[in-house]
Design a protein with these regions (language model features):
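The feature captures the beta-strand-to-loop junction immediately N-terminal to the Walker
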Residues: 46-48
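Helix-to-loop junction immediately C-terminal to a conserved catalytic motif
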Residues: 61
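Conserved ABC ATPase "signature" region
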Residues: 77, 124-143
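Conserved ABC ATPase signature
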Residues: 148-152, 156
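Conserved catalytic motifs of ABC-family nucleotide-binding domains
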Residues: 169
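Catalytic Walker B motif of ABC-type/P-loop ATPase nucleotide-binding domains
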Residues: 173-176
Length: 266
């Protein structure tokens, strides 16, 4: 399902992936894949176990060097910049890793201030104010800032991690399995939070997930990693695919339920 040139020509490309090959030893994960992510959209990334969803995310943000191909973020090739230039680029995105990745020895507020300390010269008072503001933004009470990660529920850890990802007011947000491990109610609430923040802040979101309900609730388009390649479309478009995995995922019981929910919402 190729990207339609006439539909996309005027869109601002935030992430541009071309000819990407990722491999570990002789095992090829991604085989010459192309992907564009447009400003202001929520792109979901889904695929079976071992399809390399998180590997793709880490390739985009420069944590994994691809064997072949190029990755551009905001028009800059991530493998060609370093030092201060890379720092300036990193300040334009925020990342929420799957487990929250909070430092257990620091309070939630201190965790939120980590990127502020790393990338800015802000004073302590201003950092405290920003940490409090970000907690409020993700729906956590003020006293959460004084707690340690071990004192938080799974849903609160995800929200605290999101607050840290938003600390530098990024334009681009990477979310790696944001609802994994959450009960259905908490997952639904987190989906609603993502969509609300995306609209309010004008974010571009790159969202890795296995959850079709999250895809339905939050995404504009979906990139499916299958057979080392990538297929891109909406849920409705992907349901028409002849690929067995895609057909089963989007047209199975949960896929049909998600589509029914979409129809009711409209």
């Amino acid at each position: 399902m190729a990207q339609n040139q006439s539909d996309t020509a005027k869109k601002d490309v935030v992430i541009k992936v071309r000819g990407l090959v990722n491999a570990f030893g002789s095992k090829v994960i991604h085989d010459h894949i192309d992907l564009d992510v447009y400003r202001g959209e929520v792109l979901g990334v889904v695929g079976g176990s071992g399809s390399g969803k998180s590997v793709l995310l880490r390739s985009v943000i420069g944590l994994i060097r691809p064997r072949q191909g190029t990755v551009e973020v905001f028009g800059q090739k991530t493998d060609e910049i370093e030092g201060p230039n890379m720092h300036r680029l990193e300040m334009r995105w925020g990342v929420l890793f799957q487990a929250g990745a909070l430092f257990s020895s620091q309070t939630v507020a201190e965790n939120i201030k980590v990127p502020l300390r790393e990338y800015t010269a802000m004073g302590e008072t201003l950092m405290d104010e920003i940490a409090a503001m970000k907690l409020n933004m993700v729906g956590l009470p003020p006293d959460t800032g004084d707690k340690y990660p071990a004192e938080l529920s799974g849903g609160m850890i995800k929200r605290a991690g999101l607050a840290r990802a938003l600390a530098l007011d990024p334009e681009l947000l990477f979310l790696d399995e944001p609802t994994a491990g959450l009960d259905p109610i908490s997952a639904n609430q987190f989906d609603e939070l993502i969509k609300r923040l995306q609209k309010a802040l004008g974010l571009t979101v790159f969202l890795v997930t296995h959850d079709i309900d999250t895809l339905r609730a939050t995404t504009d388009r979906i990139a499916v990693l299958v057979n080392k390649k990538i297929v891109i479309g909406t849920i409705t478009e992907l349901r028409k695919s002849d690929d067995p995995w895609i057909k089963d995922y989007f047209s199975g019981v949960r896929g049909r339920a998600a589509l029914a929910d979409m129809a009711e919402a409209h």
